[in-house]
Each structure stands twice: as C-alpha cells, then as structure tokens.
Regions:
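Amidase signature
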Residues: 54-176
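Fold-level recognition of mixed alpha/beta catalytic cores in primary-metabolism enzymes, strongest
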Residues: 1-69
C-alpha cells in the first residue's frame, strides 16, 4: 500500500495485521492480509482511519521502553541508516539497541514466501482454476510457484516461523 501510494503522490498505510476487521474481504493469504487505504487529502485519510481503526478502542499495552532493532536497521540503505542514527543520537541518546533474530533476511523471506504462497494456493488458486481469468505473466509465475508448494515445505516453514517468533519475543526487554 505505501509504495504504490508514494508513486502516485498519495498517502497510504498498511496497518498491523488484524488491526482492522477483514470480514467481507476476499482472503488471499489470511496470515498476512490486512486492510490498508490511500487518500490524496489528509482530512480524507484521517476520516478513513477513524472509521477503519475504530479509535474508540484503546490498547491495553503499556510501553515503558523503546529499543532500536539493529538487524532491521541494517536492511535499510546506508544513507537512511546514517540519518536515522544521527536522529537517534540527537533525540534519544540512551536508547537501547537489540538484535531481534539470528536468522538471516533471506531465510525469513524464503519461509514467508512458502507460508504466503501456500495460503494463496488454498484461497485463490481454486477461484483461478474455476474462472480462468486473464492474468499477467508475472502474477501467473507466482501462482504457478504457489501451486507447487508441498505440505512438507509448509510444515518446515511453520516450524521456522515459530522459531523466529520466539527469538523476537526473547530479544525484547519487558515493557517494549
């Protein structure tokens, strides 16, 4: 949502998974699907957010600490990293730094693709098979890849996901 919005000169947001109710939304990959929106005017963007995010709900989370996830920052381009570090040094000089995981970016991406692809296979492939729509070669290649994902690959990817979740949870101090 954010990248297409920025290319079109719009504001766009992709909220946290499950933050907005997805009832009535056709599932693609339910473990990852979320509802986002675009708008050109800030007033419209805000009104949509007020409706979709239901601002009457308040979080019960109490944040006592904030941290910098160094391994996530390392993914950013060098210029972005440097500017971010300057800002942190200036505004939050004592902030703690953590590493969320020992797993590599490529391992995480590969397992994400398996889990997401399997959900696409379960949710979208039956519709495509039945309706035979015209699909771009790029999307067709992704659908083809998803159709070949095995149950064993999914099982291993779920084990990997559980390991990643535990690593992230264990890396964060209380109250973050």
């Amino acid at each position: 949502v954010r990248i297409p919005a920025s290319f079109c000169g719009l504001m766009g947001i992709r909220p946290t998974h499950d933050r907005i109710n997805t009832n009535g939304v056709y599932p693609m990959a339910p473990s990852f699907d979320t509802v986002g929106w675009f708008a050109k005017k800030i007033e419209v963007f805000q009104k949509i957010g007020d409706v979709l995010l239901n601002n009457n709900e308040t979080s019960k989370a109490i944040f006592k600490n904030y941290v910098i996830a160094e391994d996530l920052l390392e993914i950013a381009e060098t210029e972005v990293q440097n500017e971010f570090k300057k800002f942190i040094d200036l505004k939050l000089p004592g902030i703690s730094k953590v590493r969320l995981s020992t797993l590599t970016k490529s391992e995480i991406a590969d397992n994400f693709r398996i889990l997401q692809g399997n959900e696409v296979k379960e949710n979208v492939l039956p519709w495509i098979t039945k309706n035979k729509p015209t699909i771009s070669p790029e999307i067709n290649a992704r659908i083809e890849m998803a159709s070949k994902i095995t149950n064993n690959e999914v099982k291993l990817a779920k084990i990997f996901r559980n390991k990643l979740v535990k690593e992230v949870e264990n890396s964060l101090p209380e109250g973050v």
